[in-house]
A protein has these predicted regions:
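Nucleotide/phosphate-binding catalytic cleft detector across ATP-hydrolyzing
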Residues: 1-27, 41-153
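A glycine-rich phosphate/pyrophosphate-binding beta-strand-loop-alpha-helix module
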Residues: 38
């Protein structure tokens, strides 16, 4: 990380917990207000990351910026091609974020030139099980980090 650069404490906590549970060569994806991607090397050092608008922020921005678009909650749409405004918005954001996660994780992995473990956390995280081919672990509950549980199973 560049000297003098600040990293949010939430991002550092995510990477420390991720490293403790899964070891290094890690990408932690946090679906919060912002969707962040934080990278930890094989020794546990924080490398850097990516910040993108969050899922809910994107939906809210559509609602705020376009008067005709309603407030919509994120959920996995039944189809990619929506047949009404709500379904179209959900599809655009849901599948758009699946693409965002896949592409950013693929590019980080290529840049690091080594296999990476990818874990996810955050509010809308349970809404993205379709991304299980990319995200290896979903840290949804505090008890996911129980010391008596082997995180690699």
């Amino acid at each position: 990380v560049d000297p003098g650069t600040q990293v949010g404490p939430d991002r550092l906590v995510n990477t420390v917990a991720g490293f403790d549970l899964h070891g290094g060569d890690l990408i932690v994806v946090d679906f919060g207000t912002a969707t962040t991607f934080d990278v930890v090397d094989h020794d546990g050092a924080y490398v850097g990351g990516v910040i993108a608008p969050g899922v809910n922020l994107s939906l809210e921005a559509l609602h705020q910026a376009a008067a005709a678009l309603p407030h919509v909650d994120i959920s996995k749409p039944q189809r990619v091609v929506g047949t009404n405004t709500v379904a179209c918005m959900q599809s655009g954001v849901f599948w758009g974020y699946m693409g965002l996660v896949r592409e950013i994780c693929a590019r980080i992995t290529a840049e690091r030139d080594r296999p990476m473990t990818i874990v996810a956390t955050g509010g809308p995280c349970p809404a993205v099980p379709a991304g299980r081919d990319v995200v290896r672990r979903l840290a949804r509950r505090p008890d996911d980090a129980r010391p008596d549980r082997d995180p690699r199973t």
